[in-house]
């Protein structure tokens, strides 16, 4: 049985590259981003093994929903990569 990865922050950078490479290796991957439009290309390229889910890692309900959708679809989550970041931006003087 194929292992299932859940990777957060797949809209760009490391998360996106890791999702693509993991899918190329034949794993199931839950590809997440706040805006699913940014990950649709990946899901379209791997329709049998990629599941795109909207996920805001700052929102507990969003996290619960994403995990539930992933388990409902693939049966389990074997590997979690917490790649998404959240930053509070302000002037240095503040």
Give each language-model segment a name:
Residues 4-7, 80-81:
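Conserved hydrophobic beta-strands of the Rossmann-like cofactor-binding core
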Residues 9-13, 35:
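Conserved glycine-rich cofactor-binding loop
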Residues 22:
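Aromatic pocket-lining residues of Rossmann-like dinucleotide-binding sites
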Residues 25-41:
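Conserved glycine-rich Rossmann-like NAD(P)H-binding loop of the short-chain dehydrogenase/reductase
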Residues 39, 63-70:
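A conserved hydrophobic alpha-helix of the Rossmann-fold in NAD(P)-dependent oxidoreductases
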Residues 48, 69-82, 88:
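A glycine-rich helix->loop->beta "capping" turn
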Residues 55-65:
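The beta1-alpha1 cofactor-binding region of Rossmann-like NAD(H)/NADP(H)-dependent oxidoreductases
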Residues 87-94:
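Conserved mid-core segment of classical short-chain dehydrogenase/reductases
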């Amino acid at each position: 049985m194929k292992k299932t990865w859940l990777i957060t922050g797949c809209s760009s950078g490391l998360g996106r590259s890791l999702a693509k490479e993991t899918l190329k290796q034949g794993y199931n991957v839950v590809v997440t981003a706040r805006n699913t439009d940014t990950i649709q290309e990946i899901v379209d390229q791997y329709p049998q093994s990629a599941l795109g889910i909207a996920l805001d890692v700052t929102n507990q309900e969003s996290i619960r929903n994403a995990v539930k959708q992933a388990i409902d679809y693939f049966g389990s989550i074997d590997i979690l990569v917490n790649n998404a970041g959240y930053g509070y931006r302000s002037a240095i003087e503040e």
